[in-house]
């Protein structure tokens, strides 16, 4: 293996070494704080390797793995998100007796799976990366073994993930049986004839069904509210951000390589999934009295917004499609981390602060925490001066440019419904204070929330740096198309 290849693989090597180091530390001497600092050190070391990997990118390291600026953008996003989740885990799990340090090993391995997933260039690596991510998530979801709800959530996720993996493997087999290839590039070479390849087209739809499960797209969403509610809140934060963002980034890489935009049937299916996900997610969120379930249904709607941007921008220019998805995923990730981080900070030793009634009078008990949660909800709603508004503006703008009017109308209707249930939570927090203890915020959780809230505000008020970063992410695979962008003002088979 060449020096350039080793340099490109540095983020994966460092994260793998960090996971092994944490396991050895646990085996030698159990210390929650030591393991936490090893995890943070591993994530920071992974971040420090990204400039070195970028210096040799783009590079096809093997037939399975491609390291390029597209993947490295999401590597940075996922490592930063995992760092925030590690801080939330320190504050959340150290308050609970008999909670062991293995949560940090699982956090590192699941993050490694996300990095592998977004850098996949072959369906085999797609499957391997997805399984590394998913298998690490099973015990994370069921981690609080003393409670029945996390265990139930873990079993549900395990069973339905197995079904999704079956769809994925069967779809891969059908694609290989019809085309004789599994690499994204070689599948793309058959893109013009996919409509005349019914077996391969059916295989792609099965792969889409597996991806739809991971993204909670309707009708593959039924696991989402129960798992979000049952999992420990820091794990829910990871599941809602890194897990979903990595799968969507892979969706963009795979289906653009396969030239799916040439298939009218495929675009119609994606558009239909976007419409029903937006409407179902928002309407079901109206009925919730649990904040975590409300955010679960909200996440379904946000995946629909992302699909809208995927379809509409893909009809215009590929580089605009990448810019739209990259910006929206970054905005959604930081906003969701803030919302779930606030819920995690409010949870006590005995139970999660999950019911809306738990937030009554929060503004009077903890004004700062209420302000952070309010900011995250306003960003999810797409209110101006937040990063969520800029992300939703991207989706709306590309929809108008592409003249996909049914999708644009659905985004407007869904956003209007979303404003109602997000503001319902805000109004609950400013009700007169009842009986309730003042909230004591752990320094780790406070640091994570302060940083995330600052990003929401800064990127909402001054979005151009993040827009530039998203615009500089090349389309996977690179194209020769001239750039069009939005600005703040406008070997194996």
Swiss-Prot record:
It is found in: Cell inner membrane. Keywords: Cell inner membrane, Cell membrane, Membrane, NAD, Quinone, Translocase, Transmembrane, Transmembrane helix, Transport, Ubiquinone. GO terms for cellular component: plasma membrane. Its main location: membrane. Coiled coil: none annotated. It catalyses: a quinone + NADH + 5 H(+)(in) = a quinol + NAD(+) + 4 H(+)(out). Pfam families: Proton_antipo_M (PF00361). Residues 473-493 are annotated as: Disordered. It comes from the Bacteria. Its EC number is 7.1.1.-. NDH-1 is composed of 14 different subunits. Subunits NuoA, H, J, K, L, M, N constitute the membrane sector of the complex. NDH-1 shuttles electrons from NADH, via FMN and iron-sulfur (Fe-S) centers, to quinones in the respiratory chain. The immediate electron acceptor for the enzyme in this species is believed to be ubiquinone. Couples the redox reaction to proton translocation (for every two electrons transferred, four hydrogen ions are translocated across the cytoplasmic membrane), and thus conserves the redox energy in a proton gradient. Belongs to the complex I subunit 2 family. This is NADH-quinone oxidoreductase subunit N. It comes from Methylococcus capsulatus (strain ATCC 33009 / NCIMB 11132 / Bath). The lineage of its organism: Bacteria, Pseudomonadati, Pseudomonadota, Gammaproteobacteria, Methylococcales.
């Amino acid at each position: 293996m060449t020096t350039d290849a080793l340099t490109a693989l540095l983020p994966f090597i460092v994260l793998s070494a960090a996971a092994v180091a944490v396991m050895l530390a646990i085996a030698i001497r159990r210390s929650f704080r030591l393991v936490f600092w090893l995890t943070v050190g591993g994530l920071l070391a992974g971040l420090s390797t990204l400039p070195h990997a970028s210096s040799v990118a783009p590079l096809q390291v093997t037939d399975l793995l491609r390291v390029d600026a597209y993947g490295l953008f999401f590597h940075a996003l996922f490592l930063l998100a995992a760092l925030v989740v590690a801080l939330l885990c320190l504050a959340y799990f150290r308050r609970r007796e008999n909670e062991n340090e293995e949560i940090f090993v699982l956090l590192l391995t699941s993050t490694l799976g996300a990095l592998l997933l977004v850098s996949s260039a072959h369906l085999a690596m797609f499957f391997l990366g997805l399984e590394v991510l998913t298998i690490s998530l099973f015990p994370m979801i069921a981690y609080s073994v003393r409670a029945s709800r996390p265990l139930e959530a873990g079993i549900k996720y395990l069973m339905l993930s197995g079904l999704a993996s079956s769809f994925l493997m069967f779809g891969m087999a059908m694609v290989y049986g019809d085309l004789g290839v599994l690499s994204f590039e070689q599948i793309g070479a058959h893109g013009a004839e996919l409509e005349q390849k019914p077996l391969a087209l059916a295989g792609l739809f099965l792969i889409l069904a597996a991806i739809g499960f991971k993204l909670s797209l309707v009708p593959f969403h039924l696991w989402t509210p129960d798992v979000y509610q049952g999992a420990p809140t820091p794990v829910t934060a990871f599941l809602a951000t890194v897990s979903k963002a990595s799968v969507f980034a892979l969706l963009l890489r795979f289906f653009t390589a396969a030239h799916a935009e040439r298939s009218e049937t495929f675009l119609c299916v994606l558009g239909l999934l976007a419409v029903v996900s937006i409407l179902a997610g928002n309407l079901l969120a109206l009925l919730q009295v649990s904040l975590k379930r409300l955010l679960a249904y909200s996440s379904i709607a946000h995946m629909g917004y992302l699909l809208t941007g995927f379809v509409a921008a893909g009809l215009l220019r590929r580089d605009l499609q990448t810019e739209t998805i990259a910006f929206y995923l970054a905005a959604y990730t930081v906003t969701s981390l803030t919302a779930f981080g606030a819920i995690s900070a409010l949870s006590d030793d005995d139970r999660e602060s999950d019911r809306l009634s738990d937030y009554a009078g929060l503004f009077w008990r903890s004004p700062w925490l209420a302000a952070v949660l309010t900011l995250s909800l306003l960003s999810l709603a797409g209110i101006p001066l937040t990063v969520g508004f800029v992300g939703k503006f991207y989706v709306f703008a590309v929809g108008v440019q592409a003249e996909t009017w049914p999708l644009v109308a659905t985004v407007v209707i869904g956003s209007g419904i979303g404003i109602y249930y997000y503001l319902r939570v805000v109004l609950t927090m400013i009700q007169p204070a009842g009986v309730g203890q003042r909230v004591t915020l752990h320094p780790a959780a406070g640091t994570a929330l302060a940083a995330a809230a600052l990003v929401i505000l800064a990127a909402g008020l001054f979005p151009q740096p993040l827009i530039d970063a998203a615009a500089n992410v090349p389309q996977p695979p690179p194209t020769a198309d001239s750039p069009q962008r939005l600005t703040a003002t406008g070997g194996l088979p």
